[in-house]
Amino acid sequence: MDELTRDALNALPEWLRSLADDLAVLAELLKDTQLSEGLRLWVAGAVGYVFKSVDLIPDGIEDLGYLDDVFVLRLAAARVAEENSESDAPLPPSITQLAEGAALVKKLLGSDFARLDDFVSGLRIAVVRGVSPSDIVQDPALAAQVCDEVASFARSYVPPPFSHDERTLIKLKSFLSAKLP
């Protein structure tokens, strides 16, 4: 087993376990008016994706469900950290940790990473349940409502099982390669 495979098989189950907490930390940024609207659009798009009924990988698929969600959160966090690097508004350390995970996603997906990154960029304008990320960012009451929905999700979220098997990574990469636009 190579180092990348070992790193991924160790990280992915932990990412699945922390999904609810990671989502909650990101969602809290929606209410932080010190952050630019552009940064909060990244967050709103990623948070909306988790609640979207049509995922790249349906959440119920054994071993793979929610992995697309944890990837999207990390890529969005990386964009937030990157674009915030010259700002005076500090980000919570947990956002930086999420952002660091994007490097593993990039290594794992190889040539398909650019397609996922483009997909995540498009989430900034994706409408979920009739609400766009800009609606959320511009309306404090709507941002608070999204945070409440995230808190409700976090209370009921049960991390799915994950097989520490190289075949799981092969299935994951194949699924994303086939589904990414």
Q: Predicted segments — roles?
A:
Residues D22-V25:
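Amphipathic, well-ordered alpha-helical segments in soluble domains
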Residues Q97-P181:
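Intrinsically disordered, low-complexity, charge-dense segments enriched in Lys/Arg
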Residues D63-S94:
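Membrane-interface alpha-helices
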Residues K31-F51:
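Transmembrane alpha-helical segments and their cytosolic interface motifs
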Residues A46-L73:
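Membrane-inserting effector segments that mediate pore formation, membrane fusion
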Residues M1-A20:
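Polybasic, low-complexity association/targeting segments
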Residues Q34, I61, G65, N84-D88, ...:
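Long, hydrophobic, amphipathic alpha-helical segments used as structural scaffolds
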